[in-house]
């Protein structure tokens, strides 16, 4: 909302027509799906839904963003409600879509009603006509229908032209440093050539019809207009009307034939900006005094001339021309030149440098001379338009019908069957520009200037210098984004490098700037036309080849554990003390289903390395704790093997993970540390093994201190030992199967290891714990856990892709979804289940989160947006859960040694334990992980509560 005002500034450059409700609904739905930051995707998705007759930039990214900001400003932000169970707060996107959907439904109902009325009316008319009652009015009806049709077509045409004109204007405004999207190349035809002598005589007037044909407001920017210096900018009172009688131009003019013979490409477009350099103007051969050109005064009347003054094309009477003005070439494309207005006002006396003289041919009497145009500097105009084609006869210039051949020192442009020999309309694209530039390269280095073909008597004056000067003055090229491509820019740069040596003064600033800005624009991803999903796609797909490192971690773990299983027995005993009997699966949890197979993402990769890392710093407390747990496990012969099953289970979460979504995981820093820590030296392995082994031997001496816990543990041991044996015997095979009663495969073993840490009491032995007058404490602990897990849920619900997973999927949104996905899951359902008590542990929460993402991955194809959203969001949410479990496990480890010793004095122990935890040594893994997790006290309390619940 805050950025809405900034976005509204975009409206000045975008289309101004109002959006239809249908278009707004498409926009809002696309934003709800792709998010309000991804305008590339939003724009691409709704392009097919534009109403007919819309301009090409209607659904541009800026226009979409601007329109959506308008929608946001006109929509009330929904107030956040608190405390209502299972209700997810509606977002602004939902409100907008709901409102527009209702409006669109009403609109469609209205359309249906109108269509039905029209149908009934037409049916009634048809029945009357068939019955013969309307015979007298048939002609009238036909005329009415024809008139209506004609009016509709005219309206559509006017609307289309207005839309095109507005689109062209926007395209021109988009590139303010450059000129209008018109390329004017003026090439002298008559007396403007420095090396040629032109016969002067009668003036042939031009037809005004030809001059004004096709001139509409939409085509004004691209209409070539001949501008006269010295002519007043306003219409004089006696100016000729548009209907002034004119003689049409003859198509077989010798000038045209001569132009056809000398059809070579125009001089380099790199010279256009030299109009701005006032120092070069005095020496220009363009500034020709009228006194040197004897024109019979009788031919100066009724000549139609088009003058461009701010886009208006008034008609100037020929008699208004002053005989002393200088004919200076000025094209609309050069309107940005600072010296142009001064040139128009300046008289010939201000230019002190002598000008090349243009004399008439002495051998022919002046009476016989065929007149050139009244403009002594008549030019052939090339109009290069990237977008709007102009009529071929859009400008009127008088032609010379002189039979005398004229020398043409400058290369001219081929005329391709154009009615007016002085106007050539060329539709520009990048190929033509590059062809012109190639020919320019050849032309620029010709040493001489073409000689007159016979009839011209005056020699060219210093051919090469004249060519340069003529190029400086004659060519005005405007560069637009549409004309430039990489090839063109390369050609321009090549010409620049070549020209620096020969004509350093001829370098064109505009061309260089155009080339540079084109290159800069193409560095900006927004301006490139190609689809921009691919880099994102590649980044998303980068994590895919990661299972290999995970498998190496697994293998190293297995080797490491085989080498020092006794030490790791105790390490895991420390972690899982007091609750290990829950491995016995005779009473599976009521909430668990087969979907749990994919639910467990082990936090253990981020757990074990800190333990190993800090072995040197806290070996003594741990070894004493190991002794205590050894007592709790009992002293039977197989007692050492049982914990190993838990070790092995925790040691291979990646092997469980890789079949379903292991390819989507990204190694976080802790996992990388895991890999390094498992490559520790053999000496450290042996040392830790001997320390833990010696502690186990000392353990059985304190059996007398144990209470009902050890008895309960020993009661349950035979089953668990058998299970551990079965697991150990198959440890080296690929997917080992545990002999569990509920039929889960080894993939569920990781889940069970998590259940050790945070599931509710479910086995008979653990029910003995709950008898110990802790019902009230368990309820309190459950409340605290619920608050803590809701923090994790809220982090997931605030994810940038969460709006896809917030609500249940309906068959309207995804056809056939419920036939493919047997157990749908979404964030609102998970929240409801937490509040209702259906989810009572972190493992169940993680299971349902995983289920939700796996449903999305299963249903959508791998190239679908929702698929990639699910993969990315799954990775982020699982990181949150892993951090939660990591802190939980470390705190459980630090607490378990004391709680296993004396359960009766647990209250005092817990207080003492809490104070110990608050003073964790700075080198310990618990301290590091608390830093990594933010180290908040509330999170710690929540995890303590989780552990209380399970006891």
Curated annotation (Swiss-Prot):
Subcellular location: Nucleus
Residue(s) of cross-link: Glycyl lysine isopeptide (Lys-Gly) (interchain with G-Cter in SUMO2): 542, 554, 582, 648, 685
Gene3D superfamilies: Bromodomain-like (1.20.920.10)
Listed Basic and acidic residues bias regions: 610-622, 673-688, 904-919
Any one of the GO BP annotations: positive regulation of double-strand break repair via homologous recombination
Matching SUPFAM superfamilies: Bromodomain
Cross-link for Glycyl lysine isopeptide (Lys-Gly) (interchain with G-Cter in SUMO1), residue positions: 554
Domain of life of the native organism: Eukaryota
InterPro entries associated with the record: Brd8_Bromo_dom, Bromodomain, Bromodomain-like_sf
Biased composition (Polar residues): 204-226
Modified residues (N6-acetyllysine): 85, 554
Keyword Transcription: yes
Entry-linked CDD domains: Bromo_brd8_like
UniProt region (Disordered), positions on chain: 161-273, 520-547, 584-745, 900-922
Pfam families listed in its UniProt record: Bromodomain
Subunit structure: Component of the NuA4 histone acetyltransferase complex which contains the catalytic subunit KAT5/TIP60 and the subunits EP400, TRRAP/PAF400, BRD8/SMAP, EPC1, DMAP1/DNMAP1, RUVBL1/TIP49, RUVBL2, ING3, actin, ACTL6A/BAF53A, MORF4L1/MRG15, MORF4L2/MRGX, MRGBP, YEATS4/GAS41, VPS72/YL1 and MEAF6. Component of a NuA4-related complex which contains EP400, TRRAP/PAF400, SRCAP, BRD8/SMAP, EPC1, DMAP1/DNMAP1, RUVBL1/TIP49, RUVBL2, actin, ACTL6A/BAF53A, VPS72 and YEATS4/GAS41. BRD8 isoform 2 interacts with RXRA/NR2B1 and THRB/ERBA2. Component of a SWR1-like complex.
Name of the protein this chain belongs to: Bromodomain-containing protein 8
Lineage of source species: Eukaryota, Metazoa, Chordata, Craniata, Vertebrata
């Amino acid at each position: 909302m805050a950025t809405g005002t900034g976005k509204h500034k975009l409206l000045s450059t975008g289309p101004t027509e109002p959006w239809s409700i249908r278009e707004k609904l498409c926009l809002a739905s696309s934003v709800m799906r792709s998010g309000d930051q991804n305008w590339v995707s939003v724009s691409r998705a709704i392009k097919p839904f534009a109403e007919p007759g819309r301009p090409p930039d209607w659904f541009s990214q800026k226009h979409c963003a601007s329109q959506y900001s308008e929608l946001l400003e006109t929509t009330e932000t929904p107030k956040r409600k608190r405390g209502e169970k299972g209700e997810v707060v509606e977002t602004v996107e939902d409100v907008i879509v709901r409102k527009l959907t209702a409006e669109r439904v009403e609109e469609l109902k209205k359309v249906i009603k109108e269509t039905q009325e029209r149908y009934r009316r037409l049916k009634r008319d048809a029945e009357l006509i068939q019955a013969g009652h309307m015979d007298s009015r048939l002609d009238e009806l036909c005329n009415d229908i024809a008139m209506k049709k004609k009016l509709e077509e005219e309206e559509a045409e006017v609307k289309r032209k207005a839309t095109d004109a507005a689109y062209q204007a926007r395209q021109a405004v988009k590139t303010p440093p450059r000129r209008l999207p018109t390329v004017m190349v003026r090439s002298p035809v008559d007396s403007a050539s420095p090396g040629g002598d032109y016969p002067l005589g009668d003036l042939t007037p031009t037809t005004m019809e030809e001059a004004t044909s096709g001139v509409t407001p939409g085509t004004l920017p691209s209409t070539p207009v001949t501008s006269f210096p010295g002519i007043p900018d306003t219409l004089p009172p006696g100016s000729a009307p548009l209907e002034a009688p004119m003689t049409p131009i003859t198509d077989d003019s010798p000038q045209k034939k001569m132009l056809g013979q000398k059809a070579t490409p125009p001089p380099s477009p790199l010279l256009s900006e030299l109009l701005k350099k006032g120092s070069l103007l005095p020496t220009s051969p363009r500034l020709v005094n009228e006194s040197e050109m004897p024109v019979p005064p009788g031919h100066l009347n009724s000549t139609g001339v088009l003058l461009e003054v701010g886009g208006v094309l008034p008609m100037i009477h020929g008699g208004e021309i002053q005989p002393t003005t200088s004919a200076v070439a000025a094209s609309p494309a050069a309107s940005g030149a600072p010296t142009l207005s001064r040139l128009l006002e300046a008289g010939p006396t201000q230019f002190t440098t002598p000008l090349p003289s243009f004399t008439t041919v002495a051998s022919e009497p002046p009476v016989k001379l065929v007149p050139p145009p009244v403009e002594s500097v008549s030019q052939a105009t090339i109009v290069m338009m990237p977008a709007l084609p102009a009529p071929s006869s859009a400008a009127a210039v008088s032609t010379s019908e002189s039979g005398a051949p004229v020398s043409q020192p400058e290369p001219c442009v081929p005329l391709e069957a154009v009615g007016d020999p002085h106007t050539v309309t060329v539709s520009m694209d990048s190929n033509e520009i590059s062809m012109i530039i190639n020919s320019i390269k050849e032309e620029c280095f010709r040493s001489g200037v073409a000689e007159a073909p016979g009839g011209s008597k005056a020699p060219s004056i210093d051919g090469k210098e004249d060519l340069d000067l003529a190029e400086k003055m004659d060519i005005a090229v405007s560069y637009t984004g549409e004309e430039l491509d990489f090839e063109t820019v390369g050609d321009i740069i090549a010409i620049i490098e070549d020209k620096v040596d020969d004509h350093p003064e001829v370098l064109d600033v505009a061309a260089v700037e155009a080339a540079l800005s084109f290159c800069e624009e193409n560095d900006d991803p927004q301006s490139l036309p190609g689809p921009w999903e691919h880099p994102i796609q590649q980044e998303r797909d980068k994590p895919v080849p990661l299972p290999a490192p995970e498998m190496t971690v697994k293998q190293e773990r297995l080797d490491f554990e085989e080498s020092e299983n006794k030490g790791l027995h105790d390490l895991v005993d420390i972690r899982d003390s007091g609750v290990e009997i829950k491995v016995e699966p005779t009473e599976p949890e009521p909430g668990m289903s087969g979907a749990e197979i994919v639910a467990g993402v082990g936090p253990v990769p981020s757990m074990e390395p800190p333990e190993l890392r800090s072995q040197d710093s806290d070996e003594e407390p741990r070894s004493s704790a190991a002794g205590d747990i050894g007592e709790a496990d009992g002293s039977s012969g197989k007692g050492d093997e049982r914990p190993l099953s838990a070790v092995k289970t925790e040691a291979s979460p990646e092997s469980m993970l890789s079949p379903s979504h292991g390819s989507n995981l990204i190694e976080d820093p802790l996992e990388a540390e895991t890999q390094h820590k498992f490559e520790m030296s053999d000496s450290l392995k042996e040392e830790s093994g001997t320390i833990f082994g010696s502690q186990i031997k000392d353990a059985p001496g304190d059996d007398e201190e144990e209470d009902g816990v050890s008895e309960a543990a020993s009661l349950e041991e035979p089953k668990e030992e058998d299970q551990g044996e079965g697991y150990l015997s198959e440890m080296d095979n690929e997917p080992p199967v545990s002999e569990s009663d509920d039929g889960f495969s080894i993939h569920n073993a990781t889940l069970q290891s998590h259940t050790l840490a945070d599931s509710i009491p479910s086995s008979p032995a653990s029910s003995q714990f709950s008898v110990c007058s802790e019902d009230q404490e368990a309820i309190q602990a459950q409340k605290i856990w619920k608050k803590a897990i809701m923090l994790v849920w809220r982090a997931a619900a605030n994810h940038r892709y969460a709006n896809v997973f917030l609500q249940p999927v309906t068959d309207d949104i995804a056809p056939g979804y419920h036939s493919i996905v047997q157990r749908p899951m979404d964030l609102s359902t998970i929240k409801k289940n937490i509040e209702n008590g259906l989810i009572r542990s972190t493992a169940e929460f993680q299971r349902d989160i995983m289920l939700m993402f796996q449903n999305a991955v299963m249903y959508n194809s791998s190239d679908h947006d929702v698929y990639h959203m699910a993969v990315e969001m799954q990775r982020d949410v699982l990181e949150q859960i892993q951090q939660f479990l990591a802190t939980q496990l470390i705190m459980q480890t630090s607490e378990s040694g004391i709680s296993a010793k004396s359960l009766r004095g647990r209250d005092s122990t817990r207080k003492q334990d809490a104070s110990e935890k608050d003073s964790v040594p700075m080198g310990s893994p618990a301290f590091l992980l608390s830093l990594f997790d933010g180290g908040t006290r509330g999170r710690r309390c929540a995890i303590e509560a989780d552990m209380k619940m399970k006891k």
